[in-house]
Amino acid sequence: MESIIEIKDLSFRFQADQEHYDVHNITFHVKRGEWLSIVGHNGSGKSTTVRLIDGLLEAESGEIWIDGDCLTPENVWEKRRKIGMVFQNPDNQFVGATVEDDVAFGLENQGIPLEEMEVRVTEALSLVGMAEFSKKEPARLSGGQKQRVAIAGVVALRPDILILDEATSMLDPEGRLELIKIVQKIRQNHHMTVISITHDLDEVAMSDRVLVMKKGEVESTSAPRELFSRSDLDQIGLDQPFVNQLKQSLRDNGLKLPEHYLTEEELEEALWELF
């Protein structure tokens, strides 16, 4: 599978005279159509990295390749059209008086004809389950509903890449899971590439690969299953999955269970075999 994003020896610091780099000499790629989660403690460089990819920040050194072209000041606006970004706080993203106005805002800026705009707004709101709220004021929505509208606004623009910068962190567990499932559906229906910065285990589990950042550098990349087998998850800003905690408790009480990570279904099967 070809890469839609390639990062090569990328470095950045917010102040030219500061000693440490916020992002230092990182190299990684994102395959077209995959879901890549980026995890790590606060201050590890996650958000800075995606802002460099989106052209919101300019790298001090290194290269960013998007869909076969190296990102430059001359093509940054063109490449930014390929990327949609949803941030942590949806209230900071609303500009329209109604839900449908807000989703239409980006389309108006791109000069999309009115008829096509109406179709795209309707499709995007239906996709995130918010069509019945199209005439509502955004301020009257719940946190989860606001994030759905924010995602609809991005989807309506039909980008190739969707970046979620801790977009589920302010939601309750049920709201987070609903939003993750919506993103997965969008990804499958539109063949979209997803990059998510997250501390949420369900979000990580949904991804194809996980990139771990530590002190501005790439510490490792792995499949979620391999990541969850690590004993030092707390050192990279993640909790142990509940199934890991349960399995360890059972092992401590004498049950012979595998050391490697098991899904809930696999743990259930292992317990049935023991009894």
Where do the model's predicted regions map?
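Conserved ABC ATPase "signature" region
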Residues: E115-F133
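Conserved ABC transporter NBD signature motif
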Residues: G62-C70, K79
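Catalytic Walker B motif of ABC-type/P-loop ATPase nucleotide-binding domains
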Residues: L162-D165
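Helix-to-loop junction immediately C-terminal to a conserved catalytic motif
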Residues: D54
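The feature captures the beta-strand-to-loop junction immediately N-terminal to the Walker
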Residues: V39-H41
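Conserved ABC ATPase signature
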Residues: E137-L141, Q145
